[in-house]
Design a protein with these regions (language model features):
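Short leucine-rich amphipathic alpha-helical surface patches
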Residues: 102, 106-109, 127-137
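Amphipathic alpha-helical repeat scaffolds of TPR domains
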Residues: 119-129
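Short intrinsically disordered, low-complexity coil segments enriched in acidic
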Residues: 1-11, 149, 154-158
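Catalytic core of nucleotide-sugar-dependent glycosyltransferases
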Residues: 72-79, 86-112
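Conserved nucleotide-sugar donor-binding catalytic segment
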Residues: 2-85
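Membrane-interface aromatic/basic loop that binds lipid-linked glycans or pyrophosphate carriers
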Residues: 131-169
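Solenoid-like repeat scaffolds
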Residues: 79, 110-115, 143-152
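Soluble or luminal CAZymes and related metallo-dependent hydrolases
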Residues: 48-52, 93, 97, 122
Length: 169
């Protein structure tokens, strides 16, 4: 999509799909009826104060879809010390919640019927998990026997670690 938005024929979408299925790197404004969030409990991790909102979006994907609108609602400038600019620093400071969030994202994308969307997204998520563990724990992550196939990514995850977490160290 040359205009960095969804095909107009797509009338409903789940928020995580914008990133994982449609590969859009965009900011969104999301309007949610509170009734859909009554049962949602945002997970808390002791000593941590940040968790990606993607957890909530994955929860909402089980409730229904959003109707995408391609219109400008607000204009903004990123703050130099804001969330987006410091995301990898936040990931390091909030390790348990970030791993929880990434693992939930992994489970979400593994349900995709399209093998390309599923594996491309899964690889990026696993590399983020491995890179975060290398950075935060200072060790090469051990993998469970059922995850042995992901060992092939460890070298790439190290490069990912250097590129993504260098500023946060």
């Amino acid at each position: 999509q040359g205009n960095n938005w969804l095909n107009p024929k797509i009338l409903e979408v789940n928020i995580p799909d914008l990133k994982y299925k449609y590969h859009l790197k965009i900011e969104t404004c999301i309007v949610i009826n509170n009734a859909y969030l009554v049962d949602f409990e945002f997970p808390c991790f002791e000593g941590e104060n940040f968790l990606s909102e993607e957890i909530m979006y994955i929860y909402l994907s089980k409730k229904g879809y959003f109707c995408p609108q391609n219109r400008k609602i607000y204009c903004f400038d990123y703050l130099e010390d804001g969330l987006t600019s410091n995301i990898f620093k936040l990931w390091r400071k909030n390790f348990k919640g970030t791993i929880f969030s990434l693992e939930n994202s992994y489970m979400y994308v593994m349900s995709f019927p399209n093998i390309f969307d599923r594996w491309w997204s899964a690889i990026k998520i696993k590399m983020n998990i491995q890179a975060l563990k290398m950075t935060t724990l200072g060790v090469i992550p051990t993998l469970k026997s059922e995850e042995a196939g992901w060992k092939i990514l460890l070298g790439f995850s190290y490069l990912w670690k250097v590129a993504r977490f260098k500023k946060s160290e």
